[in-house]
Amino acid sequence: MKIVILGAGSVGSNLHHGLSLNGIRAELVHARSLTAEGAPAKAEVPEADVYIYAIADHALREVVARVDAPKALHLHTSGSMPIEVFGPDKPHAGVLYFFQSFSREVLIDEWSGIPCFIEGRNIDDIAAIYSLAQCLTSRIYEANQHDRERVHIAGIFANNYSNLMYRIAEDVLKGTQIPFEALLPLIDQTAAKVHVMRPKDAQTGPAKRGDHEVINKHLEILKTTPYAELYQALAALIGKEHSR
């Protein structure tokens, strides 16, 4: 089976790396060559049995339209784009959505525990996508667009927004002699707890306890920063959640 990955960004680079580690050769094609001004309507891409589009959502339709391979299996890797992005000229199509945070700077070596959400146009396509996903992980779930969109939103809260909280925490420590590394055991313990208990049950802190004296003191310290309003909103949300 010949595989071509279209897009050499964070997702494409990691997929290429992961497949290579598992003995599967895949050719990586840079998206720039497919979306550059003056690029031909039908791109010259290597022939393949499977095309994996690791392309940003805003450019996906453009790249899909430029690939002329009606017999191949076409897969996108997006959590929010529908399978219908592949038109009738691509009858074999689906989704291969690995639910992980990817970056080109840190390539992932261990894929076996990464969830993969798949969708296909028919039973045969689903079977082929499942077999491909199995080369990397055993945690494979069929998921339509409705479910993928919601898991994508959940992932943004759990990953992207939590990472923003780390950056804010780092900023709050500026002007002190305390390094961000002092927070790492706390961060690790918080993540470890949700492996064995519900997030609601793992919640701690002054907002859960209804300790308004501490909350108000923190708001006073934060009043000259951009974070006071966010702190107050989060404290109110936690307080409401735990007053039920």
Predicted ranges, named:
Residues 3-19, 210:
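Glycine-rich adenosine-cofactor-binding loop
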